[in-house]
């Protein structure tokens, strides 16, 4: 038996016991509260400073550490909606759990049964892959996909080299097609469903359906678009707490225990040299010090959401990847640093205080809808066509960023936190630059 096979068995055995005997964390309040003194929750304030030092050194821009449903420590722009990058996959995994639980989706359906094909025609063997194989990144379909990283292209296996459910390959084709299948099978918009089935039940404060978008790569022979999702650190912390509680929220089993168990089953193990990690249903699985199961959603640039049920712990770290500023994930380092601050001396009813997040200090002007509509246009930037359109949320840039008028030639792009400038030609505003 190979060392990877042994590791997979070890992870599976330990992960299967992760929720056994673990006390369920409290649900967060409708608005986040924090411990008045971490000591009352069994943590040293002095030692938790090391977590903030790590945050600063790591170049992160938002951090939330939640213990037993309440905020233990936080820093940065926790209300700012950042691109989740690959963390979006874990959100979609949850939607599959909800909608397979209510019978709308059968994860054993094959691509052939679903009528799934692509511009590059799939073989009969490829079309025998089931939805659950895509959730595991084990479809056996190895063709170009929208939004691929260079490493995905470099390590893509040859077509036909592995039958479905026999080989792990972190595959954007699988992930992209899952977004389309969800809409086909449920008849619901992916992002509206995320809002109705997760954001609202979990009392998320910042997410809106417009924070999701599909985009296509016209240079590739594929009909399936990539999907992007923006979400704040404080909303992701609620999502993580749902999993920390075994799918239970406010007395309701939002995700079945069976789905949680299947999600956190290690179907594949990846050897990164200095460490191993496994993959479940669009979640990563690690063992801290070979004994403590941790589950994580990870996004390019150092974005992480980590769930440690044994310690009722949820950690979210974000980076301003909109500006190209990322960092290392450092999952193990963060968790070890937090756990090293434990004192085990608690009080029965720790004092809680509201978590106060200061809103952005920006001055905007009022502008009538008719005037805002004048700014609608298309232009070419950074290799692709961009749009400014008017809709439900007002004037929106790139289908994702609400534009707030500062003057008749300058708008502030929410979340992106940059200014979009226009010049006037023949009494019409024309896009000029972003700064």
Placement of each model-derived feature along the sequence:
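Peripheral terminal and inter-domain segments
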Residues: 21, 347-435
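Active-site-proximal loop and beta-strand segments within enzyme catalytic domains
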Residues: 27-42, 46-53, 84, 88, ...
